[in-house]
Amino acid sequence: SACNTIEYIGIETYNPAEITFPKNVDKVLIVNNAVPQPDDVGYTYNLYGTVQDTARAHADSALYDACHSLGKSIVDVSFFNDVLLYHDGTRQDTKYLVDEKLTPETVKELCRETGTDAVISLDRLLFRMEKDVVAFAEGFVVGGVDIEITGVVRGYLPGRDNPLATVYVQDSVFWSESADNMELLKLYLPSPDEALRAAGQYIGRKVTPNFVP
């Protein structure tokens, strides 16, 4: 059998960012202003044709991962002098479907507290995950995980009544594996929590070009 090796050659190209921050913005703060969806919302697990009513997936870590991934991707571009990740979520309510903007007072206080010039905030992030496992007569099983991601990310400047810009995000990620039995399939496919975290990391990277060239 023949083996082909694919070589990737890195070429640095810079396109204009979708959102232009003022030249005096030197340090930015990444903030999680989204509320995680409940564990029993947005996840459907279909096992051998039967929907499992005990399916649960935790989205709180995925929100953190999205912010962390966004911050790291911005750092890698070396556009701003410094990028900070705020240690706490900013919302205390449970209204996960509500897209709630940061208030001008909150933006001003966050920048004052952290010594930053602007805020990039994840204001909403929702996941819809479907997992399907099918058994074949030949004795093997096939499983797939499909996640649809929707979100809202905004740029804020202290002293402004309205956000600098709003980015609406919609994307998806997918895994598909086959195995001789169910136990092996579990090793190949990510767990529900792992899949959501991977989706969060992915969407954080995907949003980055909106804010940096």
Enumerate the predicted regions with their spans.
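C-terminal/domain-edge helix-coil "capping" segments
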Residues: 4-25, 154-213
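N-terminal post-signal-peptidase region of extra-cytosolic proteins
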Residues: 13-14, 100-107, 133-140
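Envelope-exposed proteins and targeting segments
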Residues: 24-27, 39, 115-118, 145-151
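N-terminal segment of the mature soluble domain
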Residues: 34-121, 125, 160-165
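Glycine- and small hydrophobic-rich membrane-insertion segments that are intrinsically disordered
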Residues: 41-57, 135-144, 179-186
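Amphipathic beta-strand/beta-sheet edge segments enriched in Tyr/Trp
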Residues: 123-179
